[in-house]
Amino acid sequence: MPRRIDVRKVLMLGSGAIKIAEAAEFDYSGSQALKALREEGIETVLVNPNVATIQTSYKLADHVYLGPLQPWFVEKVIERERPDAILLGFGGQTALSLGVELHRRGILSRYGIRVLGTPIEGIEKALSRGKFRETMMKAGLPVPPSTPATSVEEALRAANEIGYPVIVRVSFNLGGGGSLVAWSREELERWLVRAFAFSGTGEVLVEKYLHYWKEIEYEVVRDQYGNMVAVACLENADPMGVHTGESVVIAPCQTLTDQEYQLLREASLRVAEAIGLVGEGNVQLALNPRDSWEYYVIETNPRMSRSSALASKATGYPLAYIAAKLALGYRLDELLNRVTERTCACFEPSLDYVVVKVPRWDLEKFEGVEKSIGSEMKSIGEVMAIGRNFAEALQKAIRMLDIGEPGVVAGPRYEEPESLEEVLGKLRRREPYWPIWAAKAFRLGASVEQVYEATGVDPYFLSQIREIVEVAEKLRRTKPWSSEFLDLLAEAKRLGFSDEQVALLTGTTVEKVEKARRSIGLDRPRVRQIDTLAAEWPAATNYLYMSYNAYEDDEPITTGRPRLIVLGAGVFRIGVSVEFDWGVVSFADEARRLGYEVVIVNYNPETVSTDWDISDKLYFEELTLERVIDIYWFEKPVGVIAFLGGQIANNLAKPLEERGVRLLGTPGRSVDRAENRAWFSQLLEELGIKQPSWTAASSIEEVLKFAESVGYPVLVRPSYVLSGSAMKIAWSPEELKSYIEQAARVSPRYPVVVSKFLEDAVEAEIDAVGDSRRTVGTVIEHVEPGGVHSGDSTMVIPWFSLPETAVREMIRIAETLNEVLEIKGPFNIQFLVKDGSVYVVELNLRASRSMPFTSKVTGYNLMRAAAEAALRGRISYGFNGADGFKLLRPTGWWGVKSPQPSWQRLRGAYPGLGPEMRSTGEVAALGRTLHEALLKSWLSVQGNRIPPAGSIVLIYTPTGRGSSDLSQAAKLMTEKGYTVYTIEGMEVDGAEPLPLEQALRLVRMGGVGLLMTTDYAPQRDYRVRRLAVDLGVPVVLDARLARMLAEAINRVGLENLEALELREYWGPNVEPF
């Protein structure tokens, strides 16, 4: 059937900011869907406040609205744009829940908007726990014993009837938000209130906990005529009770018999049929490891999901693209497989390789957080590795995590002295990165059975890890360079060992291991092509990986143009997110426009850059020195771009250059001078540029003497780190000693710098691109003071309180550094401004986290300028002849970027701001005034809302700092009709004080609509902040932001927030990008 012709304009809802459980996989799936719609000539309207994504650009969408994903704002967009239809399946749970709410309020019917894909009724059947259970039972599909509950009392009764242990699941949620496993009534009662706070419908499901059952997922595609295929089977190595987002996941399934595979596949197809799926859905099932015929259907997601993104990249089957086409009315057999360009979309992929996904956590950044993993997602990102066997793929995946481990064995966690009982304790508690702890347990003499009892991981996977350990320990015992050693080395390479691992195990150097490897004919791994059908049909794309388990290269397709390699950002973690992927994809576009063949190296399954049609060649590979050099010598490019991939790529710049790799852009020696804190501080002194007083930490005694001379507080900063890792403000000698030790552990090879911390300074920065003579950029002012990491700050363009003299000095410094360091690409300088003086804090000679925001607010694509600077040596874009600094300063509009925290997801963590970054994503909005842009941006952060008039607002200061701003906020909120309270001992003027216990009771009873506070003082107010975030109360954590927000609520209000398209602010003379 041809597609429906009554759809000419489609509204698509994005997923908003990157947050735990809802990350860049939706940027990828949404981008694919927009691409599919554009191919069909359909006009698209996108609502998504995530300024950092490729999706919110005119490359894909016809109309882009940065604004809150809330019904009132989306209705304003609908009123202006009048779309024919809406797509809900490509923006995660945020888009689905919002779509259901638009339907319930009658907004969709009022404007005659049709829902494409799975109908609302099907969405509700899938996402309401009670309705899903009924639907499955009606379809004759088994579900675990369970009871829906709408109150704490009902849930406790249900658990008594079912019997402990139980798992509590929340309706209309994702990432296991609010879910829990309870082994007793006391444990259940303790966390139920929090579970209900996560539920959008006030409903939870109390279900029998299936201890150590296997968790299997199928990705199902179905058209509206009932044709369907199971595109992928994903096996969770972790058992039931560990959220799939927290689990090690393998494709294809490794431990199922054919009987089990077909049984569960058939069940998955019946689930899709039962809910009326149209497009793509994920079905999760539990299989009893002791009885092949006993299984249960656990849940389904009638939308693109994290697993869908993984399945797409693992199989080469473009699930989101196909799902969007099916939503338009196509049949499966009418659509082509875009990898082979010969077979149709109704062919189920077949894999001749193994894919392993491993999550990445950043729990050490959060004080008080619960460290074990379970039914609720806490991981920030994930990696995907491809190998010819499980061991090879797993070793690659561990390296890709960028946690300082060279693989499953030989790293610091594996080598640190511990007893077997200590290691088994970590496995029982489910501490992150269990494959390393399992390997260590085997090294200490544990049996497969012992590790299985501690983890519930199938013995097959455990035996593969034990094999890695056996080879590692043999290497350790064998005389280097003997014939036995060389045989072992060949075996180790086939099991995914890196040269660094072998060197660590044998006490030799990487160079010697490499020489030995070459002597036995292993010059490099072979290049393999992903074709989706196990080589039955030739592939028409360059989707590649490398393996030592192959004897010849697949021949990639070449264009004949000069070739360059672009290094991606790797795994997402706090500080590295989709902003860097925006840079990679935007730069790749510009490089191709300038006539280059672009080869991207990256391994993040969530990203647009790892989509095989973004570049001329994609290597889904490690970003390690060994692998990048392998690719470099095979591809023979004109050079490598390392300034777009965040800290991973930046840290590779110098070692790559030392190995003869040609870096394009800013020279490696300049990068080294900027990243090494001590060297950079010396450079600033030579240039006469002010900086806070500093010293390099050569000994604790010297540092303490320095701190005494300049006075506390002081700032401790390691080198070559991102997101402020181990960056701390020390207020006493005891704190300083502790922080120096932490910083030395994070960056052991480089100096730790200690500098005077300037209290109450304004923080500002310049985002720019330079070519050594020309500089183009903008000045950004932070709302929060210096001392709050830039990634956690509210950013404003143009500046709003900086003196013009300070801005001129910042521009002068940028021009000087551009010339002196021979910059040829993007850079970012961070400043502190105090009493009119400008101090440089740091310089990053790479694309910054804020560059998508800068570009989209100003209407100037910094990546286009970066491509010209790096590849042509000269920026022409936007220049009319003269050199110097081109200042990008919007007139008539403002842009505000707000951080997206994930406090609620991180049970136990203290919500507070400081020099180490803790937010997981960002949003932005534009407005005609600063207050309009600020309010719109703040409301775009998930969980933020303006409480109804008459609600209670709690405002206090735990340290006494910020009391003036908070008092003004209290006065303004009172004027607006709110009841404002403060806390005794932490009072602010203009609010009625309450004893701490009474304030806690008020929060617990749901009486507080907004909390405003400041500073980082867990010993003073941990309970108030933690309870507020657990119960979903919006929290403002800085005094100046609280005051400005109160002004915005007073002056603007929801009714006056405009819904304008991005380019309406830019004006007609800006070329959309």
UniProtKB/Swiss-Prot annotation:
InterPro entries: ATP-grasp (IPR011761), ATP_grasp_subdomain_1 (IPR013815), CarbamoylP_synth_lsu (IPR006275), CarbamoylP_synth_lsu_oligo (IPR005480), CarbamoylP_synth_lsu_oligo_sf (IPR036897), CbamoylP_synth_lsu-like_ATP-bd (IPR005479), CbamoylP_synth_lsu_CPSase_dom (IPR005483), MGS-like_dom (IPR011607). Mg(2+) 2 binds at E299, N301. Mg(2+) 4 binds at E842, N844. Mn(2+) 2 binds at E299, N301. The keyword Repeat applies. Residues 944-1073 form the MGS-like domain. Its cofactor is Mg(2+); Mn(2+). Residues 945-1073 are annotated as: Allosteric domain. It comes from the Archaea. Its EC number is 6.3.4.16, 6.3.5.5. Residues 403-555 are annotated as: Oligomerization domain. One of its GO terms (cellular component) is cytoplasm. Residues 133-328, 681-871 form the ATP-grasp domain. Mn(2+) 4 binds at E842, N844. GO terms for molecular function: ATP binding; carbamoyl-phosphate synthase (ammonia) activity; carbamoyl-phosphate synthase (glutamine-hydrolyzing) activity; metal ion binding. Pfam families: CPSase_L_D2 (PF02786), CPSase_L_D3 (PF02787). Residues 1-402 are annotated as: Carboxyphosphate synthetic domain. Large subunit of the glutamine-dependent carbamoyl phosphate synthetase (CPSase). CPSase catalyzes the formation of carbamoyl phosphate from the ammonia moiety of glutamine, carbonate, and phosphate donated by ATP, constituting the first step of 2 biosynthetic pathways, one leading to arginine and/or urea and the other to pyrimidine nucleotides. Composed of two chains; the small (or glutamine) chain promotes the hydrolysis of glutamine to ammonia, which is used by the large (or ammonia) chain to synthesize carbamoyl phosphate. Tetramer of heterodimers (alpha,beta)4. Belongs to the CarB family. The large subunit is composed of 2 ATP-grasp domains that are involved in binding the 2 ATP molecules needed for carbamoyl phosphate synthesis. The N-terminal ATP-grasp domain (referred to as the carboxyphosphate synthetic component) catalyzes the ATP-dependent phosphorylation of hydrogencarbonate to carboxyphosphate and the subsequent nucleophilic attack by ammonia to form a carbamate intermediate. This is Carbamoyl phosphate synthase large chain. It comes from Hyperthermus butylicus (strain DSM 5456 / JCM 9403 / PLM1-5). The gene is carB.
